[in-house]
Regions:
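Active-site-proximal helix-loop elements at catalytic-domain edges
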Residues: 1-31
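Residue-level detector of well-ordered alpha-helical segments, enriched
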Residues: 19, 38, 42, 54-58, ...
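Acidic-glycine-rich active-site phosphate/pyrophosphate-binding loop
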Residues: 24-43, 91-97
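Phosphate-handling active-site elements
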Residues: 31-41, 67-81
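C-terminal binding/interaction regions
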Residues: 77, 81-131
Length: 131
């Protein structure tokens, strides 16, 4: 089985899913969350920073995976905040907005693949450290 980064890249690059959906489906596959195409429709609108360059869809997808895994924990909101900080640091950007992240990381041929793969890497490490 592929790791989280490979799964996310496959969904994003090979299957053409948006950033949020790619992370969600990769997380579902790797962590056995039982989510499918119908569930993924909930995150379609988060791609491209909700279509206006706002909050990064890869971050939104990551938070959704964390929610499925950890939402019953009392410290869930704190965990989310910690992941957002890790995401910012990992992508070396002072913002979580798609527009700013894309300006820094997007490439003409691969679009935001680098952001999606990095988000998946960060998410995998974060889950392992907080499980």
């Amino acid at each position: 089985m592929m790791n989280l980064q490979e799964q996310a890249k496959m969904y994003y690059t090979d299957q053409g899913k948006n950033c949020a959906v790619a992370i969600l489906l990769a997380g579902s596959d790797v962590y056995g969350l039982g989510l499918g195409a119908e569930d993924a429709k909930l995150l379609v609108g988060f791609g491209g920073g909700m279509g206006c360059g706002s909050t990064c869809g890869a971050l939104a997808g990551s938070i959704a995976v964390l929610g499925k895994l950890f939402s019953t924990r009392e410290d869930f909101r704190v965990l989310c905040g910690k992941f957002v900080k890790l995401f910012r640091e990992g992508l070396q950007c002072d913002s979580v907005d798609c527009a700013k992240l894309a300006a820094k990381h997007k490439s003409p041929d691969r679009k935001c693949e680098a952001v999606v793969v990095k988000a998946a890497e960060l998410l995998g490490k974060f889950i392992a450290e907080n499980a």
